[in-house]
Each structure stands twice: as structure tokens, then as C-alpha cells.
Regions:
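A short, basic N-terminal segment
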Residues: 1-36, 41
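P-loop NTPase nucleotide-binding core
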Residues: 41-44, 48-155, 160-163, 169
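Substrate-engagement module of ASCE P-loop NTPases
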Residues: 143-146, 175-180
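Substrate-gripping "pore-loop 1 plus following alpha2 helix"
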Residues: 168-176
Length: 180
């Protein structure tokens, strides 16, 4: 008999079992704009739970952004991925992505790179100027887009402990707390 369970990666659909109470509570928190932190040992299904709930609440009026911080090797890379994902999830077409980046990231000279599937595969880079408000502008991006478009945005940061490996993790965390 084959094992019906999947281990070691996020699951969805029929592989996601139980956790109804957790999902219900997280759904309520995210729908009502309540900052929520999930803490448990590794491999207990936090990522699967967040992805399930954010897929359920994602709509025309409430957009969800999922960022795997584990893939970020530096503070700069976090900002780049953060900006890319926020723009991607809050805009539906290439020209809208570009327009959104131009409007909301105008002070940092955004540059787009498109992959083989330009509708889904693109990344954003920018000129980094430590003397301006680049970090602040990027971290405020969801709030500014939400206000302009009349929507709400939920941002999920998975594997947040990865910031401990950034150059100056305490300063980075202080920036996040100050702006968010």
C-alpha cells in the first residue's frame, strides 16, 4: 500500500487534511487585516496552511502576496523579490506591471526582465541608492497600491527566520517594524 501523505513540501488540494480550526482562524485574521505570526516546529504545515487560506481569500478586492524569504540571500534580494511579487500579484497584465512599477517605484529606476512566459515569469531590479528612501518606498508599496486601486493586500512572509543571515539583521528588522 502506498503512503497517501506527502512529506517535506507544501501540499494542496486533497493532500491538505485536517487543520479546519487553524484555517478558519487564519482566514478570519487575514480577512480582517490582523497581523498574524505562525510559530511551530519545522515541517508542521505552516506554509501549506498559509497557501490554502490565501488562495481562498484572494479575490478582486483582496490580493495576496506570498514571499519565501528562504530564497533571499541578502536584504537587497529581499527588497527585489518583495517588489516583484507585490507588483505581479496586484496587476494582471504586462503593461499594467510596468505602469504600476513606474508609478509606485519611480524614485528607484525599476528594470524588468521577462522569462519565456512573460505573463507569469518576470523579475524586477532597480538602481540601489542608499541615500534615498528606496527601502521605505518598497516596503510601503502594498499600502500605496492598495490605496490607489481601492483594494486590500495581504503579504505573507514565509521562512522569516532567514533574515538572521542578512548582513545587518537587527537594522533590517527595525526598518520593517518602523514602516509596517
Amino acid at each position: 500500500m502506498n503512503n497517501p501523505f506527502i512529506f517535506g513540501k507544501a501540499v494542496e488540494g486533497s493532500y491538505f487534511t485536517d487543520r479546519q480550526e487553524d484555517a478558519k482562524r487564519l482566514h478570519a485574521n487575514l480577512s480582517h487585516g490582523i497581523n498574524t505570526i505562525l510559530i511551530s516546529p519545522r515541517r508542521w504545515g505552516k506554509t501549506s496552511l498559509v497557501k490554502k487560506v490565501t488562495a481562498e481569500i484572494d479575490s478582486k478586492d483582496l490580493k495576496t502576496v506570498f514571499i519565501d524569504v528562504f530564497s533571499c540571500k541578502s536584504e537587497y534580494e529581499f527588497y527585489r523579490i518583495f517588489a516583484t511579487e507585490v507588483v505581479k500579484q496586484t496587476s494582471s497584465k504586462i503593461d499594467e506591471w510596468i505602469e504600476t512599477a513606474k508609478i509606485f517605484l519611480s524614485n528607484i529606476s525599476p528594470k524588468f526582465s521577462f522569462g519565456s512566459d512573460p505573463m507569469n515569469d518576470f523579475s524586477l531590479s532597480f538602481e540601489w541608492n542608499e541615500h534615498d528612501d528606496t527601502e521605505k518606498e518598497i516596503l510601503q508599496l502594498p499600502e500605496k497600491i492598495a490605496e490607489k486601486k481601492g483594494i486590500r493586500i495581504v503579504v505573507s512572509l514565509d521562512e522569516f527566520q532567514q533574515v538572521a543571515f542578512f548582513g545587518d539583521q537587527l537594522t533590517f528588522q527595525k526598518k520593517l517594524r518602523t514602516i509596517w
